[in-house]
Amino acid sequence: MATKILALLALLALLVSATNAFIIPQCSLAPSAIIPQFLPPVTSMGFEHPAVQAYRLQLVLAASALQQPIAQLQQQSLAHLTLQTIATQQQQHFLPSLSHLAVVNPVAYLQQQLLASNPLALANVATYQQQQQLQQFMPALSQLAMVNPAVYLQLLSSSPLAVGNAPTYLQQQLLQQIVPALTHQLAMANPATYLQQLLPFNQLAVSNSAAYLQQRQQLLNPLAVANPLVATFLQQQQLLPYNQFSLMNPALQQPIVGGAIF
């Protein structure tokens, strides 16, 4: 009797265990590499280790942060290469004309090459051209400084003509150096022609040549103003070379004794 009761209890236990039991599917044992094919990425990351998730997140952030500067650098390098290519093409296009200019006029070629690198040329073209013209007259300036330092210093001072038109000013200064010598040579070689050139500029010389000569001697010699005899002597000395008869016969040129004067 007791054996039957134990057998019934065992059967009841088996029935209860059979109703509560469940079967584990084999797909749950699949590797994690197959999971992303059936689940979204976030769900697949959830099955991974937290350290692996943090590492993969750092890789994604670093790639996104470095991608934009690299693209900008690539664009800048492409733009620089494009500009360099255009400049090279333009240089090759103008190279024959520049070579011809260098052969024909080296000064103009060098001036054109230095024009862009000169701040004065970019700021004030007129001043730069004036400076270039002044450099052409540097030999004349050096000669003027050696012959007459006073005039050279005057040129360097604040002269309106020197600042406005340096070549014209230098030409006038050189003429002032040459004209006295030419005038002196003309007066020594041909006094009549020299006086004839001076006559139209003085009414006294036109009306009375003797008085004009006397006036010039009085202006040049203060002793003639104080002593009329000296003025007469100088007048005679001035008029003596213009006596045609005495010029033809030097024996008739009687010297004047100066003892009575002094």
From Swiss-Prot:
The keyword Calcium does not apply. It is found in: Endoplasmic reticulum membrane. It comes from the Eukaryota. One of its GO terms (cellular component) is endoplasmic reticulum membrane. PANTHER family: ALPHA KAFIRIN. Zeins are major seed storage proteins. Belongs to the zein family. This is Protein FLOURY 2. The gene is AZS22-16.
